[in-house]
Amino acid sequence: MEANAASKTFFRSAFLLKLRESFVSVLPIVAVISILFFTGVIADFGLPAYISFLICSVLIVIGLSLFNIGAEASMSAIGKIIGESLFKKRKIFFVVAMTFIIGVLVTIAEPDLKVTASQIGVDELLLIGMIGVGVGLFVVFGVLRIIFNKNLNIMFICFYGLVFMLAGITNPKFLPICFDSGGVTTGPVTVPFILAFGAGLAASTASNGRSGEDSFGLTALASVGPILTVMVLSLFLDVDSMVYVWSDNPLTTYETFEGFWPAFFSSAGEHFLGELGMVGIAIAPTTVFYLIYDLIFIKSRRVRIVRILINMLYAYFGLVIFLAAVNLGFLPVAQEVGKGLGASEGTLGIAILIGAAFGLFGVIAEPAVHVLIRQIETVSEGTVKSLTVGFVMALSVGGGVALAIIRAYYGFSILYYMIPGYIIALGLSFLVPKIYTAMAFDSGGVASGPMASTFVVPFVIGFTYSAHGAESVFENAFGAVAMIALMPLIVVQGMGLYANIKRSINNYMVRKRFHEDDDLVIISFEEANA
């Protein structure tokens, strides 16, 4: 009885803490939308749509809180357990096979990926399958890197070099989608698992003295694979015949509350039922795989398995509430705001500022971002603060969305951003501690999660559609996720470069303090006697 009471008290206090964190995360986006509504910046933004947005914001806070509690003690725990166990087998083929299966399973089940795939118009199963294969293969490369102590920088140069070689023969219309596919794979299901899997594997190989560095980098490599596999897929598709089909969300068309509430509750029911199935499909394969793997190879105590399953339920229902609320209230509002700004003349500057704000505040609300920055602080033993990384990521993502809006308006190729951006990012990787490079590339993948695909992307699509028409959406609107994924690579490594320079200056000042003028005289005296 006392144990149950203590457990309930712990859950209550943990939930209240996560509730407060989630509220602070979502509040800035609510503030931006509220300012736009009350100032009348968006003409077609009615009170019913605003009220539905507020209701969904409350649901997002609740869902995010439940997910964060559950993910820490379920998906992260499973990833670490399997990661530690795999290396102990000492059989490379077994490690490779299991890693590939895990990579494919967690990817094809990622809800974030399904949201993006539904907006493209390509066969969803084919697209998701190719992305899953890409993630599986490149997680294998990441695991082999840890086992054989290979340099992460060199791997990034080789793989991104291959990406830009394939970009030369990929249809420009499909190129932004290829780059976006690398970002949307790393969402709330994939990231906690892969991060913990890498940490568990790195802990098992800690004798090489690189455990901290090796804990990161898997998510980054997992983001490269889908870019390559989707580029290959595009070579076999009739890309030129693809047309984006715009559809207005019925909930944003109501100017009064007459008939609104029945439509709202009907749509809410459809979204929640849909997410119950989608998230169930997302989490079930990983859970079943863990139970079978544990039964055969680990044989954990029943108490630990039950605890993991209970927390998996928290994560499940939290993710259901989060995604349903985002799709119900956030996506249509973001689309409407973008459409309204694109339809007005002279609003590019406002669109850039609003897009930057959405990116900046949206990344704070990303479930997977909280998982990553907590692990960064843990692995670095507090030397890299989670608050600092979160702040830097938010600034970089805001800048990335602003650049995406500029590209959507002027319509130039995404390669004008990607090529110099990755040259800078890869160049910085040779100037900063390797752990910063691994953290930066992981941050890029994590930042482009469900808030990006369901809030930022619809905003950019709405803006592009209204400004230039449906025919320009594929080539100009898509690519926003790729920009969100790119900017943290530069900014987080820039943070590492700043830390390096600051350390060098401090060391120089210390040496200078101990170097007195009399020392020169003594040296000179000795030389004279010689």
Specify the residue positions occupied by each region the protein language model found.
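Small-residue-rich segments of transmembrane alpha-helices in multi-pass membrane proteins
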Residues: 29-31, 91-99, 158-169, 188-194, ...
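Helix-loop-helix junctions within the multi-pass membrane cores of secondary transporters/permeases
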Residues: 83-85, 92-163, 348-429
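Transmembrane alpha-helix boundary signature
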Residues: 41-45, 67-78, 104-116, 172-175, ...
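Signature of multi-pass transmembrane helix bundles
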Residues: 1-69, 84-85, 182, 195, ...
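C-terminal membrane-solvent junction of multi-pass transporters and transport-like membrane proteins
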Residues: 179-186, 211-220, 429-458
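Hydrophobic alpha-helical transmembrane segments in multi-pass integral membrane proteins
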Residues: 169-177, 228-238, 322-329, 402-403, ...
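Transmembrane helix-loop boundary segments of multi-pass membrane transporters
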Residues: 51, 70, 117-129, 146-161, ...
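Alpha-helical transmembrane segments
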Residues: 139, 143-149, 174, 200-214, ...
